[in-house]
Every structure is written in C-alpha cells, then in structure tokens.
Amino acid sequence: MSPKLLKILNDSYQAVKNDGEDVIKGLSRNLKSLPPKYFYDDRGSELFEQICELPEYYPTRTETSILEQYADEIAQITGSCELVELGSGSSTKTRLLLDAYQKIGNSFTYIPTDVSGGILKTSVLDLQEKYPDFTIEGLLGTYQQTLAYLESITTQSRTICFLGSSAGNFAPQEFDNFLTQITSCLLYTSDAADECLC
C-alpha cells in the first residue's frame, strides 16, 4: 500500500467563503491589505523559491548556515519525534534536519504543511522517495487550520519548525495569537520536552 500523500484541512466551500471574507475585510480597511496566504498559489510558491536563491535575500542563507551547524544537535535533543514544519514550501532547508534525523536512525515522522497544494505534493513525493524509512505526510491548509488540526491529535513527542521570514507577515497581536496556538499544539503531546524552532 502506498503512503498517504496529503491531508486536506479545508473543504472547498468553507475555504472559498473564508477567502471572500478575508478579501472584503482586508480591502474595507483604511490601510488596505490581503492575507499573505494569497501569495502562495502554485505560481507564487515557485516565485518565492526563486526569490530565496537571490543574493539579496539573506534569510535563506542564514537559516541554512544555522541548520548546517546545529542540525545534528537538534536531532539528538528532539530524538524520535513528529516534526511539523509550518509553511514548508519545498522543504529545502529542512532536508538538513531530515539528514540529521536519518543519521541517528530513530523512528521519525515529518509533516510538512503549506497552503500551496502543488509545491506540497511535489515536495512530499520527493521526500518520501529520499527518506523511505520516515513517515511523511503533508497537511494542506493555513497555519490556523494546521494548528487546530494538530491540537486534536495527541502524539508522543512533537517539534514544530517555523523557518523563513513569514513572521513578518503577521501584525504583532496576530503573531502573539499564532505563538499561543503553537504552544497549545505542544501541550497536546505526552512528552514534556517538546520544542518549537522559530
């Protein structure tokens, strides 16, 4: 039996309804805005991957450097766990962590999450081929949908990884709420040593 590829966390009617509400709310404000999730359809995700390779875009290089230096230590500290990556995109940087987990040989589950089904599906297929001993299943949905789903699932040990510059897409209060929701996801595990890598 082939492994599951994606779990879709929204039904299309509700997603369209919420999308319309988001657009109306954002464009009705004095300071017009749209939620960043609209940037990341298949084409937007592809463009962002290209932006990450530009010399001017330093966050990707900085995070890669940090992971190159500390991935083995992170894998040792977190051990056998469920690693959830919020906004995973192509999971390029995270492969450094996956390689480190592979070295220690513990049982391991990786759950990449994204709002772009195209890039998530491509990434999950590639990762399932490269890491056949890992359980890898993508979650398709927004951060809020992903975190709400994770709150309903109890697991032995969970590490949540939030890489990239997406924190800048939140208003301060929204980011506080986001971190609170991440904390709630970590409380729904049976291991007191859960981690959040931001």
Sequence positions of predicted segments:
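Class I SAM-dependent methyltransferase Rossmann-like catalytic core
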Residues: 35-36, 48-73
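Single conserved hydrophobic/aromatic residue that forms the stacking wall/gate
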Residues: 188-198
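Conserved class I S-adenosyl-L-methionine
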Residues: 82-89
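Class I SAM-dependent methyltransferase SAM/SAH-binding core
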Residues: 106-143
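N-terminal auxiliary segments of SAM/dcSAM-dependent transferases
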Residues: 2-37
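A short glycine-rich, Lys/Arg-flanked "PGG" loop and its adjoining helix->strand segment in the class I
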Residues: 176-187
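Conserved SAM-binding loop of SAM-dependent methyltransferases across substrates and taxa
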Residues: 90-104
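A short SAM/SAH-binding and catalytic strip from SAM-dependent methyltransferases
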Residues: 158-173
